[in-house]
């Protein structure tokens, strides 16, 4: 397993029967360094990569090394051999792991210190032999992109891969994805894949795998646990539940949002309860919400999107000419507004919206508040917008409404049919009943 090392570094390891995953000690001058030998992705062929006890990875030049000693062999060789056999034959796997990129599948370039989305999911599994205690897995690298570069055409490819995984006999699918646009992809898959045979679990990481505070391992273990044991057939997001490593939460894919830029527990269910929590140490899934979609016999694929849709975040002073240009001088077929409060914009745009809806453009209203639902019957401006043809979208998140509109536009041309689908609760994107416990509160006592 020294194939990641070349030239002199490879020869040294081969002569000492040292393989990746072994615990070794290196003496260099007065310094003794002990750690686990990792694969090297350095362009410098004279670098060993070691994981220290404190969790950090370091690169050590082979120059001036006085001694390299094997301490213990990798104890997971038998499990690794079994994992390779599983990977060679997808039919033997229970859970398919599909990698699309992001921090959870990242590596460090030791020349620059930069983190790049290039480490495959299989290589992560190599350093998480515990996964084999949960389920037999098979890994596929679909593509390796930063999540900000995600596009609707990639959603289609992911959906097709999920469908294929179920057709091959897998009972669950895990999708490794960057966290920034994970909620968009989760929504796209929820509308594209119906009658799911098992869970489709999106998972990511807020901290790269080289950092001691990384959430990669726990999130991936939790995701595989969810894919293995969950009773539902839904698209979900599985991420850290708190700032420690206690447990993970499983969120419905169309009711979740990344609510913090860097915290490990950044993802929260909005206007909904999490479906489950995962006690990752015990490999146990605890259901929190019984109103889930049950597994079906055969997954249906219907993945197509029309991206002639626009998400407008309303703000005071929005230039009317700018908005008019979007509605009249582009190929736009639909507009989702993230409005203020109960679903408002300035009344200055009412006639502009009226003309657009008469021209066949769908306009849907969501709220910037995120929590709560739109109610455009309370105030005068809301009623004026309703009269102009703006459609209230209940408690749908703005991003979910946008993805749903892209999916609907690809299936319907008639405005009334588009409206009918947009206000229909297709995959749990609308929660008809809100309770007090759905809104998070912060206590300063």
From Swiss-Prot:
The UniProt entry, under SMART domains, shows: Asparaginase (SM00870)
**One record GO biological process:** translation
The superkingdom listed in its UniProt entry is Archaea
Reaction catalysis annotation: L-glutamyl-tRNA(Gln) + L-glutamine + ATP + H2O = L-glutaminyl-tRNA(Gln) + L-glutamate + ADP + phosphate + H(+)
Question: Which EC numbers characterise this protein's activity in its record?
Answer: 6.3.5.-
Arranged from A to Z, the UniProt key words for this protein are: ATP-binding, Ligase, Nucleotide-binding, Protein biosynthesis
Keyword ATP-binding annotated:
yes
Establish whether keyword Transmembrane helix is in the entry. Answer: no
Asparaginase/glutaminase domain location:
93-425
Please provide, alphabetically and separated by semicolons, the GO molecular function terms listed in this UniProt record.
asparaginase activity; ATP binding; glutaminyl-tRNA synthase (glutamine-hydrolyzing) activity
The catalytic residues are 103, 179-180, 258
The record's InterPro entries line, in alphabetical order, gives: AsnA_fam (IPR006033), Asp/glu_Ase-like_sf (IPR036152), Asparaginase/glutaminase-like (IPR006034), Asparaginase/glutaminase_AS2 (IPR027475), Asparaginase_C (IPR040919), GatD (IPR011878), GatD_N (IPR040918), GatD_N_sf (IPR037222)
Q: How does it associate, per the subunit comment?
A: Heterodimer of GatD and GatE.
Q: What does the UniProt record say this protein does?
A: Allows the formation of correctly charged Gln-tRNA(Gln) through the transamidation of misacylated Glu-tRNA(Gln) in organisms which lack glutaminyl-tRNA synthetase. The reaction takes place in the presence of glutamine and ATP through an activated gamma-phospho-Glu-tRNA(Gln). The GatDE system is specific for glutamate and does not act on aspartate.
PANTHER family per the UniProt record, alphabetical = 60 KDA LYSOPHOSPHOLIPASE, L-ASPARAGINASE
- Please report which protein family the annotation says this sequence is part of: Belongs to the asparaginase 1 family. GatD subfamily.
Record-given protein name: Glutamyl-tRNA(Gln) amidotransferase subunit D
Please name the source species.
Saccharolobus islandicus (strain M.14.25 / Kamchatka #1) (Sulfolobus islandicus)
């Amino acid at each position: 397993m020294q194939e990641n090392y070349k030239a002199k570094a490879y020869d040294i390891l081969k002569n000492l029967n040292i393989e990746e995953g072994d615990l070794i000690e290196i003496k260099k001058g007065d310094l003794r360094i002990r750690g686990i030998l990792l694969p090297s992705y350095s362009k410098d062929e004279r670098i060993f990569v070691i994981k220290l006890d404190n969790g950090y990875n370091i690169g050590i030049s082979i120059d001036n090394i006085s001694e390299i000693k094997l301490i213990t062999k990798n104890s997971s060789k038998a499990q690794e051999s079994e994992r390779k056999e599983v990977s060679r034959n997808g039919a033997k796997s229970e859970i398919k792991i599909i990698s699309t990129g992001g921090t959870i599948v990242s590596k460090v370039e030791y020349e620059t210190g930069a983190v790049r989305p290039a480490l495959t999911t299989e290589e992560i599994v190599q350093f998480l032999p515990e996964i084999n205690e949960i389920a037999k897995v098979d890994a596929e690298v679909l593509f390796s992109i930063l999540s900000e570069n995600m596009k609707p055409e990639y959603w289609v490819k992911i959906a097709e891969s999920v469908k294929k995984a179920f057709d091959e006999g897998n009972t669950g699918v895990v999708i490794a994805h960057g966290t920034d646009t994970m909620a968009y992809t989760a929504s796209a898959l929820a509308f594209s894949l119906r009658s799911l045979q098992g869970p489709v679990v999106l998972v990511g990481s807020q901290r790269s795998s080289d950092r001691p505070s990384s959430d990669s391992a726990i999130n991936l273990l939790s995701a595989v646990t969810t894919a293995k044991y969950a009773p539902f057939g839904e698209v979900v997001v599985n991420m850290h539940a708190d700032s420690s490593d206690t447990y993970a939460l499983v969120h419905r894919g169309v009711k979740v949002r990344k609510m913090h830029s860097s915290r490990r527990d950044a993802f929260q269910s909005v206007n909904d309860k999490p479906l489950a929590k995962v006690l990752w140490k015990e490999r146990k899934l605890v259901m929190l919400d019984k109103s889930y979609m049950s597994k079906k016999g055969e997954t249906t694929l219907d993945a197509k999107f029309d991206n002639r849709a626009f998400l407008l975040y309303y703000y005071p002073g929005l230039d009317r000419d700018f908005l008019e240009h979007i509605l009249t001088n582009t190929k736009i077929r639909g507009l989702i507004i993230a409005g203020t409060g109960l679903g408002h914009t300035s009344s200055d745009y009412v006639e502009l919206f009226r003309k657009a809806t008469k021209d066949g453009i769908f306009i849907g209203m969501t709220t910037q508040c995120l929590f709560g639902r739109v109610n455009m019957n309370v105030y005068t401006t809301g009623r004026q917008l309703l009269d102009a043809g703006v459609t209230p979208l209940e408690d749908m998140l703005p991003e979910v409404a946008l993805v749903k509109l892209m999916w609907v536009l690809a299936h319907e041309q008639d405005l009334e049919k588009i409206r009918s689908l947009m206000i229909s609760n297709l995959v749990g994107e609308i929660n008809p009943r809100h309770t007090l416990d759905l809104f998070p509160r912060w206590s300063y006592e």
